[in-house]
A protein has these predicted regions:
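N-terminal Rossmann-like dinucleotide-binding module
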Residues: 1-51
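Hydrophobic residues in well-ordered beta-strands that form the structural core
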Residues: 17, 57, 96-97, 103, ...
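Contiguous beta-strand/loop segments that form the cofactor/metal-binding neighborhood of enzyme cores
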Residues: 186, 193-285, 322-336, 368, ...
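Predominantly a Rossmann-like dinucleotide-binding segment in NAD(P)-dependent oxidoreductases
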Residues: 15-16, 128-228, 363
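Beta-loop-alpha module in the N-terminal Rossmann-like domain of NAD(P)-dependent dehydrogenases
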Residues: 51-114
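Rossmann-fold dehydrogenase core element
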Residues: 110-128, 147-151
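C-terminal helix-rich "cap/oligomerization" subdomain common to oxidoreductases
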Residues: 1-3, 10, 71-73, 109, ...
């Protein structure tokens, strides 16, 4: 595809799409935002006008039929992701999907295999993989600066839904019954992905717990309070095939600023901490320590890890997503080899999420990969 602009159609014109996805596409001169779709046509028209798209529609299949659209970007409610992703791949489009690609890892495997069989590039909205600090730390690990990685600790937690009056996007998970995954899938997924990437190894076993700390919440669809039996806080331990170990925690009811991520890697020759939190006017810091200097000292992130015009004082939303969309454009246009953060990576993450859910409900370690029975007991 070298030599042409990349046509993009965005499905979903909500806040995250306006804050991160569409600004990322229009920031890249190699890309053209052709169309915006939303079930609320007014939102689609407003976003199209704001970002210069020539088409606004309430029917996503219209985007799939257009020859001037190469990439479909899915930024809808979680429950709609898989249907739209599948239709887009079947239509021969490259796909960027917000997480999760699907709630069940088996569905993620199906669509990952379909996309590969058709020679299509895919990407999951693992926003924080594209943070300059996170990417520079990956380069440091790969260079051997930390030696052999032993331990990975990570969390994503902030106050997004600490207030019960802050409405959730839908009432899909309202009611009683078994505790349903929420924070683990929304907040845990990005740091699980970074863990796989940093440790260069798959998780082989997990054990975890989930909690529902705020049982009643305002439901966006109804405007009323209701029982919402979801995990709003969780933690798990994991073992990697390499012999390394990890702890991962997520919550959207913990006091703290956005995005609220910290990842730590401890190796045989050093340790590093990437902290992605908007504090003191900047959105991230990177610190490193060595065996002969155990105080963690801030590391300057080279300019090449930032998008054009980017800096640590930019909003993390646009900063990280500009890197993500630029990376995907480069992959689709054939300017770089590979396809990182794709649906295969999404599969590995979703399988861990499903395994931790099993672990919580069955109170046991769960081995990976999952089998048809939902994981072997240990």
């Amino acid at each position: 595809m070298t030599g042409k602009r990349l046509g993009v159609g965005v499905v979903g014109a909500g806040r995250w799409s306006n804050w991160a996805h569409m600004p990322g596409w229009v920031r890249d001169p190699r890309c053209e935002l052709v169309a915006v779709c939303d079930t609320e046509l007014g939102k689609a028209k407003e976003a199209a006008a704001r970002f210069g798209a020539k088409v606004a529609t309430a029917d996503y299949t219209e985007l799939l039929r257009r020859d001037d659209i190469d990439v479909i970007d899915v930024v809808t409610r979680d429950s709609q992701h898989f249907e739209i992703n599948w239709a887009a791949v079947e239509a021969g489009k490259h796909v960027l999907s917000e997480k999760p690609v699907a709630h069940d890892h088996r569905d993620v495997r199906r669509i990952a295999e379909l996309a590969k069989s058709r020679g299509l590039k895919t990407k999951v909205g693992f926003t924080f993989r594209y943070s300059p600090a996170v990417r520079y730390l990956k380069a440091m690990i790969d260079s051997g600066a930390l030696g052999t990685p032993f331990i990975y600790n990570a969390y994503e937690q902030n106050s997004q839904w600490l207030n019960p009056q802050s409405p959730l996007r839908s009432g899909e998970r309202a009611g009683d019954g078994p505790l349903k995954v929420a924070s683990l899938e929304g907040y845990g997924a990005p740091v699980i992905d970074i863990g796989h990437w940093y440790m260069d190894s798959d998780l082989t076993a997990v054990v975890g717990v989930m909690r529902n700390f705020i049982p009643e919440r305002m439901i966006l669809d109804t405007g009323t309070m209701a029982r919402v039996n979801i995990d709003d806080g969780d933690i798990f331990l994991g073992e990697f095939a390499s012999g390394a170990i990890c702890s991962v925690q997520s919550s959207f009811v913990t006091v703290g600023n956005y995005p609220g991520i910290e990842v730590r890697v401890y190796g045989s020759e050093g340790a590093a901490i990437a902290r992605l939190v908007e504090e003191s006017g900047i959105c991230e810091t990177l610190k490193m320590a060595k065996p002969d200097d155990v105080e963690f000292r801030e590391v300057e992130i080279p300019a090449r890890y930032y998008p054009a015009g980017g800096s640590p004082r930019e909003s993390w939303r646009t900063l990280y997503y500009a890197n993500l969309t630029a990376n995907f454009a480069s992959e689709v246009l054939g300017e770089i080899d590979g396809n990182e953060g794709n649906f295969d990576d999404g599969l590995r993450v979703q399988e861990v999420i499903n395994a931790v859910e099993i672990s919580h409900h069955e109170r046991r370690w769960v081995s990976l990969p999952l089998d048809g029975a939902g994981g072997a007991a240990r």
